[in-house]
Regions:
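Flexible loop/hinge segments at secondary-structure junctions
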Residues: 7-313
Length: 313
């Protein structure tokens, strides 16, 4: 169901990532309160990929995205004559969680995650002791985002080497709260989702540390921001239609959204804000209406978010 914040003459349609949704929802509510409810914004959740389909077809003004835009999506937008402004808004860490009654999993290597989630593991890896022999011979039940989710794309590329490359026999949903409820109710479960959903549900889930070669690291504000939780930390984005950018309500709302003054709100939601200078670069990019992708497409640029933004202002 879409989320409607306020009433007015114009409508701004926002769709996309379930991971970014809580940020956008909170920004819409805060901004709506600050202007006395004189604008109308409707938010849906179609997943990052599903949102880009609507966005590039002209059916959404803003797309929430938990990954950068793909080359095929850039092409689809171009075919429909749509330009866009790409704005990183926060940092997230993909969090692996298990049922709180699981007393044997404390840390997983990337290779063990691959063993669980590889396409060739479908129908084959079904017990915990198949992942690590010292673990009990108990059923392994996997939960994850749907294939239209940017979280699914990012996780599969990081763990399996190719986006969308995954076993298919897992319980999937575009709504992270469905995954949380499933894991919380199943002792043999494991799943992944954005860091904020763990923070919100840490009383009913158990977080697993990840060893990417330098020891076991839990996702925290500090490890996500300083890079020690890499490669499972990532920037989150909103994409704004250049046509919609010309509308004053959109300019005002997005300027409010990306300002460093919202850093406290991001922390309250379980996300990690960028340093102030990065938020300033993002705001400048939006206010100048700089179009195109510098983080995605055929040739994504390398470096930190700040380095990439600074080189393209």
């Amino acid at each position: 169901m879409p989320f409607l914040v306020a009433c007015g003459a114009g409508t701004t349609d926002i769709d996309g990532s379930s991971t970014v949704f809580p940020i956008t929802e909170a920004m819409v509510e805060d901004w709506g309160d600050s202007i006395g409810g004189s604008a109308r914004l409707v938010i849906g959740i179609s997943g990052t990929g599903g949102g880009f389909k609507k966005f590039c077809s002209g059916d959404a003004d803003i797309n929430d995205a938990s990954r950068p835009i793909k080359a095929s999506e850039v092409e689809r937008c171009a075919e429909n004559g749509g330009e866009f402004i790409e704005l990183p808004v926060a940092i997230d860490g993909l969090t692996v969680g298990v049922n709180p009654d699981n007393d044997f999993v404390q840390c997983l290597t990337l290779e063990e995650l691959h063993t669980m989630w590889a396409p060739e593991s479908e129908g084959e890896i079904k017990r915990w002791n198949q992942v690590r022999s010292s673990w009990p011979d108990e059923r392994l039940q996997l939960y994850g985002p749907g294939v239209d989710s940017g979280t699914f794309d990012y996780f599969t590329e990081t763990v399996n080497g190719e986006a969308q490359s995954s076993r298919g026999d897992f319980t999937s949903s575009e709504r992270d709260n469905v995954l949380v409820v499933g894991i919380a109710g199943d002792r043999g479960s494991l799943g992944y989702f954005g860091y904020s959903y763990f923070v919100e549900n840490q009383d009913i889930l158990k977080m697993v540390a990840i060893d990417s070669g330098n020891g076991c690291v839990f996702p925290t504000d500090e490890t996500i921001n300083n890079g020690t939780y890499a490669p499972l930390s990532r920037p989150l984005f909103i994409y704004v239609s250049k046509e919609s950018w010309a509308e004053q309500d959109v300019k005002n709302f997005v300027s409010y959204y990306v300002s460093y003054e919202r850093a406290g709100l991001l922390r309250d939601l379980g996300f990690v804000p960028f340093p102030e200078q990065v938020h300033d670069l993002v705001l400048d990019r939006f206010q100048r209406g700089l179009v195109g992708t510098i983080f995605g497409g055929e040739r994504p640029q390398e470096g930190t978010v700040e380095e990439i933004l600074s080189a393209n202002q």
